[in-house]
Amino acid sequence: METKAIFLDVDGTLVSFDTHRVPQSAIEALQQVHESDIKIIIATGRAFTDLHELEEIPYDAVIALNGSDCVLRDGTPISRKQIPEKDFQRVLVLAQHYGFALAIETNKGIFVNELNPTVIELARLVNHPTPPVADIEKEFMGGECCQLCIYCDEEMEKEVMAQLPGLSVSRWNPFFADVNVAGVNKAMGIN
């Protein structure tokens, strides 16, 4: 039997940047889709543990962290592509050199090396708590990190990423970008 599925993004698609909620009409439509034996799969840059706004949606699986962490709704892992330590260490050096804030997304949460107005504004934009400042090297070593976040403009991003051939970048905001293992993206997660 052929499986049918729909794939949906979260921020700016299911969840409005204005209301920070999923419209009731979308919830009802997706409940009908699910009742028709069509799988609902969330494809997002967010972590699997950061989907509280979607509790009423009967999704089946999540392609989280831009394809780096694919899990069933109950948390059963399907695949996970972690940032290699050598690449993380290089990004950490570049963050210090260029002076941009750096966040890591691990199985223990999101942590930043510094708070600045951009970090605070982006947390507000997606209605998240501001990530705590931590020793991100220690947090990286003590957890499973599948995504980094660099808080810089596109010009600096190009300069930084030219020095990181093992990583790739995706951007949905002019002052922030997600960084994953090269070749990892939502399309790979779908496959």
Can you say where each PLM-predicted feature lies in the sequence?
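Short, basic/glycine-rich phosphate-binding loops at helix/coil junctions
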Residues: 7-10, 69-72, 139-141, 170-171
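Short, flexible loop segments at the rims of nucleotide/cofactor-binding pockets, characterized by
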Residues: 17-20, 40-41, 80-81, 125-128
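Active-site phosphate-binding/coordination module
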Residues: 24-118
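Flexible loop residues that form catalytic
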Residues: 11, 67, 153
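Structured loop/turn residues at beta-strand edges in well-structured enzyme cores
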Residues: 1, 57, 143
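Asp-based phosphoryl-transfer active-site loop
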Residues: 2-19, 44
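Conserved acidic, metal-coordinating active-site core of Asp-based
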Residues: 98-101, 105-191
